[in-house]
């Protein structure tokens, strides 16, 4: 699937028309395996209704395979030497490029796409980097340099290691207790399967050269690499054909655009991106979201396996739920016999490095002043966001910041009302039938920068609110009477059928069967 943003035009009961203009580079439709020049490749058009009903248009294109073959341009030794010399000259002229970046930041001319989503000094530096990189193929990005070093270490390790074996758990986000990776790792240990792990919250540009070498060697040796999020440096590699990669994506459903679905929405993503496209298999929470994951990861639909999401199994385990509730009440006695509001927003920004939340838009003081005394507020930041709001002294006994302390799934077991925005936590909340309030003060801005798979108003299983005063009133109303929840356009039953039909308490078991299947591939 190649995503196309289209405008819907319909007048006076006439047929709907979808108008769009897009340029598709056919040489990047396929990842590494290209068709033969004599083969024919059929392209067709499709669109998705809000109910996830896909319709395929009769119009299609039958094109020769040669149009899809990417021409590989490798530099000879003289061209490489010339690029190095030119890079040296450009470095001497670095003040010129930086001045050009300052002018671009001030809006006097366009900012280079390498600086998309950045501001201030960071935008100036990445603008200069982009200009020099375009001219020479080299730049000043620490991430690019260390990713290149990772690639060289991997290629060297592949020559040393004749045969792959075992499992590698790879992540650069915090591994939560009870999360996908944690549960599958426990099963691997129980079965006595050979595994290694490289788990860090440090992105590649902050890793030492020694750490990069260690990681590259582990990747080269692994028969199966298991992820639960995006690991960007992995996609710079041309993987060994016998290596399998399983993406256990951390989120359920399909809410915010992610991966390659953001083509045409975010400036820094181009069709030539290798991101995600090397996955052998990816988990999905329902058959209804398979096309979206296929599009987002740039992989065949057959590689998206709707076997469920392992971390959701606990929602079907009554004994576990009671055990966790009691453990949380023991650690946080203020929550016992209280009505708990969980505030769990997603991040703003373009990713891990730039993530933030505009806390000036959420007033803890105003909210707690109006809520009943027997209520408690828990703040749970997205893992990418480092800073949280200040908790007023008079409410520190009723407000807990557990952003770095607890698994968000576990917190849902003691939650009376969830306040969120565009976070995928809504899927788990629906499983537990928790009332949801969507505090979306920046909806239009968010849609312009990130966008969603569905129209928000037709999709959200809860009340949509845009200002703090209305949020306070709605939260107080739900604490007083949970049945007061406004009927959303899509009922929770419809929502669950569309996004969560593979979740039944046995996702971990099915995922382990897939792990063993991938390990056996090629044996």
Set out the residue ranges of the language-model regions.
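Donor nucleotide-activated moiety binding/catalytic core segment of transferases
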Residues: 209-224, 232, 378, 383-427
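A donor-sugar binding/catalytic signature common to diverse glycosyltransferases
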Residues: 225-254, 406-450
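Conserved catalytic-core segment of nucleotide-activated headgroup transferases in glycan assembly
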Residues: 176-187, 310-391, 465
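Catalytic binding pocket for nucleotide-activated donors in carbohydrate/polymer assembly enzymes
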Residues: 392-395, 424-499
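C-terminal amphipathic helix plus adjacent low-complexity
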Residues: 75-83, 89-112, 320, 468-523
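N-terminal pre-catalytic "stem/leader" segment of glycosyltransferase-like enzymes
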Residues: 82, 86-220, 224
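Aromatic sugar-binding surface patches on proteins
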Residues: 16-32
């Amino acid at each position: 699937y190649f995503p196309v943003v289209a405008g819907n035009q319909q007048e006076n009961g006439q047929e709907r028309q979808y108008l769009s203009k897009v340029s598709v580079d056919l040489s990047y439709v396929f990842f590494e395996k290209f068709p033969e020049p004599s083969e024919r490749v059929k392209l067709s058009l499709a669109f998705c209704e809000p109910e996830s009903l896909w319709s395929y248009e009769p119009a299609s294109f039958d094109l020769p395979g040669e149009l899809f073959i990417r021409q590989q341009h490798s530099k000879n030794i003289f061209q490489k030497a010339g690029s190095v010399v030119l890079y040296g000259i450009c470095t001497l002229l670095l003040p010129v490029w930086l001045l050009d970046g300052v002018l671009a930041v001030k809006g006097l001319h366009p900012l280079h796409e390498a600086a998309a989503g950045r501001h201030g000094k960071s935008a100036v530096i990445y603008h200069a980097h982009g200009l020099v990189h375009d001219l020479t193929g080299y730049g000043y990005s620490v991430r690019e340099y260390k990713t290149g070093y990772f690639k060289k270490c991997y290629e060297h390790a592949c020559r040393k290691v004749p045969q792959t074996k075992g499992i590698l758990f790879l992540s650069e986000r915090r591994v939560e207790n009870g999360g996908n990776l944690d549960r599958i790792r426990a099963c691997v240990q129980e079965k006595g399967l050979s595994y290694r792990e490289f788990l860090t919250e440090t992105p590649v540009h902050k890793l030492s050269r020694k750490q990069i070498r260690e990681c590259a060697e582990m990747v080269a040796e692994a028969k199966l690499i298991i992820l639960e999020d995006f690991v960007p440096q992995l996609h710079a590699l041309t993987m060994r054909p016998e290596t399998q990669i399983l993406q256990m994506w951390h989120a359920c459903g399909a809410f915010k655009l992610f991966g390659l679905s953001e083509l045409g929405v975010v400036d820094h993503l181009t069709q030539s991106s290798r991101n995600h496209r090397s996955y052998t298999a990816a988990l999905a929470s329902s058959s209804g979201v398979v096309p979206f994951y296929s599009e987002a990861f740039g992989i065949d639909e057959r590689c998206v396996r709707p076997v469920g999401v392992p971390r959701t199994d606990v929602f079907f385990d009554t004994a576990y739920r009671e055990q966790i509730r009691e453990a949380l009440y023991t650690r946080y006695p203020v929550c016992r016999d209280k009505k708990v509001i969980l505030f769990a927003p997603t991040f703003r920004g373009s990713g891990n490095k730039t993530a933030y939340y505009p806390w000036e838009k959420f007033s803890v003081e105003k909210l707690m002043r109006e809520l009943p005394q027997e209520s408690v507020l828990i703040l749970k930041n997205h893992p990418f966001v480092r800073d949280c709001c200040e908790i007023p002294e008079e409410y520190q006994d009723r407000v807990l910041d557990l952003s770095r302390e607890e698994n968000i799934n576990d917190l849902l077991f003691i939650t009376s009302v969830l306040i969120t925005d565009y976070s995928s936590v809504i899927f788990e909340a629906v499983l537990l039938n928790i009332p949801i309030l969507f505090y979306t003060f920046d909806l239009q801005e968010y849609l312009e920068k990130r966008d969603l798979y569905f129209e928000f108003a037709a999709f959200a299983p809860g009340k949509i609110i845009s200002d703090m005063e209305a949020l306070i009133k709605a939260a107080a109303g739900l604490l007083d009477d949970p049945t007061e929840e406004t009927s959303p356009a899509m009922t929770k039953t419809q929502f669950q059928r569309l996004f969560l039909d593979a979740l039944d308490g046995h996702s971990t078991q099915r995922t382990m069967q897939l792990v063993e299947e991938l390990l056996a591939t090629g044996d």
